[in-house]
Amino acid sequence: TANNVNTHQQPSTWYLYLIENKLGQLYTGITTSPTRRISQHRGEIVGGARALKGKGPLHFRAIFLIGDRSTASQFEYKVKRLSKQKKWAIVKQKVLPKNLFENLCEDLCRNSQYISPCEYE
């Protein structure tokens, strides 16, 4: 019966990612599934961002395991406001800058985990 169904879901793990398009621009987003999201952005399945339409090939340049959606959204907002140079510095250094997230818990940057984009290509 419907009353016996467990409606409690496990909290999702959220990722922050940066994708490079054919113009060398970086797009920032969040997802619970990097594999699904890159497929959406590439037009292989529905749901990709309009900002990336027609700008392929698209490649992950950085992926960070963040945690919950609220934290991931805060990271996304901050990273999207960075200059091109600072975004590329994140890609190159494979770390989120601590000073960018002063108002967030100090542990967040320390505990965010860089994941090789190759795992999801």
What are these regions (language model features)?
Residues 1-47, 53-66, 70-77, 95-121:
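GIY-YIG nuclease catalytic motif and its immediate N-terminal context
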Residues 77-92:
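Short arginine-rich
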